Amino acid sequence: MEFPEKKEERIKLKEGNTYFFICFALVCGGKSTFFEQIISQTTSEQNKDKYNIKIVSSDKIREDLSLQMQKKNPNMTFKQCFDKVGKETAKKFDAQIRAAINQKMEDKINIILVDKNYPQGIGKFLKSFCKDISSQFFLVFIPNIKKSIDINGLKFPYSLNYFIQCYLRLKNRHGHEVLNGEDESSKAVYLSFFKLFQNFDFYKKINSDKQYENNVFLNTIDFTDESKDIEVDKDTEILFENVIKHLRAFDMENIKTNYEKDINNYFNIIDEKYDGKGFFADTRELIKNQVIDLLENGINKL
């Protein structure tokens, strides 16, 4: 994936404008930590009175709705409730975004942190919520990577570094409202999300509508440690290729029947090589400095 050459121009965040922060990320890609901890903490440390920050989390909305349904229907499991509240989650998410827009303050920099996955691009989001192109801007954050995955024509906009580190975060995650490492389907769900990004071009996805080309900005962030040269042997690469090439995203029965053994074998290799050894560095301090630079010096315009 190649980006157009960056211009030197940087556009500073202005009072009275609204900035939507959106991430193109995998499961456990650092999105929630980026929003809830790093940005919220950094803006508070810099000058909290300067910003009006709202966060809208699709996962949190779905968890709340699932718990409400389960309370009314004690014979249903959380998973059953979770599966039933998808449409209501989408409606409530849109309503909360609109409410956040309406809470705009003219004397502050308004930031809406959009905690939701957008594997199909943000075109629909722009059409739904970009009503004032003079004061609404969309900052799309993607992982800063060295080399994207390309296995015999199977192309993904993420690096093997990023893919492995996100998986390890998922494996060791507990207490999340939607997906945890101990969940039986966690590997299949992770690969399903990854599959949605096959042949995905970040730049084309965010610039597909010329109407908004001056309102959307692409920003790279060090969500993971890209300093290591990660390689897998040919047999492991073939194993991964055979799974991801034919996998039908979120068809859990098909995945379990046809690919579960190969999936487990592949991730067992990853676990043995990289889990629990302190191989990858923590990048949160680096991300914080990148956020400070953005807040103080503005957005790089592509």
Predicted features and spans:
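N-terminal pre-Walker A segment at the start of P-loop NTPase domains
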Residues: 1-12
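Eukaryotic short linear interaction motifs
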Residues: 30-31, 55, 62-65, 120-123, ...
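Conserved substrate/cofactor phosphate-moiety recognition/catalytic segment
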Residues: 33-107, 167
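Glycine-rich phosphate-binding loop used to anchor ATP phosphates in small-molecule kinases
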Residues: 83-147
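Conserved GTP-binding G-domain of TRAFAC-class P-loop NTPases and closely related GTPase folds
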Residues: 145-302
